[in-house]
Regions:
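Residues within the alpha-helical elements of helix-turn-helix
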Residues: 34, 82-83, 98
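Residues within helix-turn-helix
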Residues: 29, 40, 75-78, 88-89, ...
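Hydrophobic helix-rich structural segments at or within alpha/beta enzyme and signaling domains
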Residues: 1-4
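Short hydrophobic/aromatic patch on the recognition helix
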Residues: 42, 46, 90-91, 95
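Terminal helix-turn-helix DNA-binding modules in bacterial transcription factors
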Residues: 12, 16, 20, 25, ...
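…primarily DNA-binding HTH/wHTH and HhH modules…
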Residues: 93-114
């Protein structure tokens, strides 16, 4: 029983870390190093504890933060960099896949809704 507790704590610490550093280029291997685990093990543990893969979690987090920044009136290219996407096109593609509309459309909808 002890081990699950400590594992879970590691994941919680990593989630906190991600929440503060989601704008940086953080790979799973870097997180695994921080946690003192193998990448393969952390990958499985992350999915078990969080219920989604690391990449999907990070993407969801970044898009959530991006939506907030777009609502706050930042330009799409600014938001792209602020949430960790150096490639503007790539950010727009990911955002569209995720939200079913481009960041600009999302921004327009937010303003219309006010």
């Amino acid at each position: 029983a002890d081990q699950t507790g400590s594992k879970h704590r590691v994941i919680l610490e990593l989630l906190t870390y991600l929440d503060e550093h989601y704008d940086q280029d953080i790979g799973l291997s870097e997180l695994a190093d921080r946690a003192g685990m193998s990448t393969a093990y952390l990958s499985v543990l992350f999915k078990t504890e969080v219920g989604t893969s690391y990449v999907k979690y990070l993407t969801d987090l970044r898009i959530k933060k991006a939506k907030k920044l777009l609502q706050d009136g930042y330009k799409v290219n600014e938001v792209s960099e602020m949430v960790g996407y150096n490639n503007y096109r790539y950010f727009c593609d990911i955002f569209k896949k995720h939200e079913g509309m481009t960041p600009n459309e999302y921004k327009g909808n937010v303003w219309k809704a006010e």
